[in-house]
Amino acid sequence: MNPSRLRAAAIALGLSLCGLGAVQAADLRLRLMQTSDVHMNLLDYDYYRDRPTAEFGLARTITRIQQARDEVPNSLLFDNGDLIQGNPLGDQVARAPAREGAVHPAIRVLNLLRVDAANIGNHEFNYGLPFLRRTLAGASFPYLNANVLSADGRAPAFTPTALLEREMRDEAGQIHRLRVGVLGLTPPQILQWDRQQLQGQVQVRDMVETARDWVPRLRRAGADVVVVIAHTGLEKHELPRLSENMAVQLARVPGIDALLLGHAHAELPGPGFEGYPAVDARQGRIHGVPAVMPGRWGDHLGLVDLRLRREQGRWRVVESQSSLRAIFDRARQQPLVDADPMPAVVIAREHEATLAHIRRATANTDTPIHSYFAQVSDSLAVRLVAGAQLAYARRAVQGTALETLPLLSAAAPFKTGGRQGWTQYTDIPAGPIAIKHVADLYVYANTIKVLKLRGAEVRDWLEMSAGQFRRADPRGPAEQPLLDPDFPGFNFDMLYGAPGELSYELDLTQPARFDREGRRISDGQRVQALRWRGQPLDDAAEFLVVTNSYRAAGGGHFPHLGADRLVIDAPDETREALAAFLAEGGVAPWAQAAPGWRLRPVPGLSLQLRTGAGALAHDAAAAGLRLVRELGDGSALFALEADR
């Protein structure tokens, strides 16, 4: 080759190498999209109120998904569990006879959405393992979980991880083969919450230990990016192994590039996590790891936008931003997007069957039944559940050695607004009670359990419930909020005997005795004047307490509760017992009974409750409250009357 041609070839080779270097140096942007805790709200329809809604529903989230996909060249879509249970549609599908080869309606929707991978949440286990396995079999994408093990503990019970290989376009327009490793995790507490369904069939492992094991395996398998889909939330303090909300601890596991979170129905990024150690509530990072949690019921789409750079032969995350895209403007009470029509077409048959079922009347009430004030006063909505449990348990103990023991019933309000939204309250008008109203009163697929406890342990049960309230400070501001917003309404148990048998008061100037994890933090005595049949409750006496499967198995971290206290392990759902109780005329006796408990007002203080504006249609004075003002965002402020 002559010198001029040699020089030309060298120049061409140099330019080619320069070009190759430019390709390798170009950054690649990857968008991770997440839904979580949809709870069968596939449509923008509220089955409890039996009408369309703009506040939640995957049908509207899908519009956000399509918009977010169209904005970027590279994206992946994930679901983080608690998909198949949570409303009457989910129950209707689970009740229907299994048809060979039929695909669950929620899975049909996710298949059409082109979901890349999904995680198994804790509520996926509510209907039992056979139903769950049939459901997952219909998915055209990998369904993951790594910390639920086989009965002998030797192997994962489900597919633990996935290595997704996708062609991605970098910012220079070049195509790269990117391998995204995905790991699924769920709370170990499934063995408590669904003990009846899972005992002897699976074991569980700590989520953090599982991640430490599997993340390096994904790296060794060639993962360029590792995404952990963890059905777990965040706590401010350090937690022991096998805890429920381990996001902060998971973020410390080396090798994780992004955390997709759920379970807590909270919103990250967002002001609710300001002040949490190691959490950047604005950028959406935990210990520097990009993270997102998209609320519940499809009210937000979660996004994690990653910028990847090729360095030393591997892709590294050099920049991230997490964000949420709402479907509804809560402040203005306006929808932000329209519903995508696809889910309504895909699940039309199941939707119509659900409507036919929930509209069937079973009983009647002369009194409105609502939960707007249920966290601060004795509520008929809660009393009816307690009464149904008592009636069931009386029949269960009849003719046994347990029949002579005094019987109590624990029940809590499930629909209490707040994070759920200011329309999310039980609100049943006087008149016919339909199946939808029964489901509104009791929204979970729990079963009935009976525990045996001493009187002192019953007192601690109430002290734990009283942790719902902030401490009232007589020397503090004249206006003080009543509720701790981090305390779930479904953990505010009220205890009842038959009408008139049990009574007590709560003194909120006392410190809480237990924290939310059930740890004793003081000798506070918020529970006052605790009486059984007119006499002070005997701390040494034995009681039977009827409750639900979640609480009996330790859900909510109540002291003294657990499987070792179980004396009746009933298989029947609380909702079934409630429907039968209402049909037998159970409303009137409890509607006419005197309140069993009350809050002691604090002279000089206005203790305030924020609740849904629907409360304006009900008698606040009967609950010992007065209206302060309507807040204009679907909520209203009430104050505890000091002279009641």
Model-derived segments and their meaning:
Residues 2-10:
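Bacterial N-terminal signal peptides that target proteins for export
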Residues 6, 19-23:
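Polar alpha-helical coiled-coil and adjacent low-complexity
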Residues 10-19:
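Bacterial N-terminal signal peptides
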Residues 24-326, 384-388, 397-400, 407, ...:
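Acidic, metal/ion-coordinating pockets
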Residues 26-31, 35, 41-67, 174, ...:
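Catalytic centers of hydrolytic enzymes
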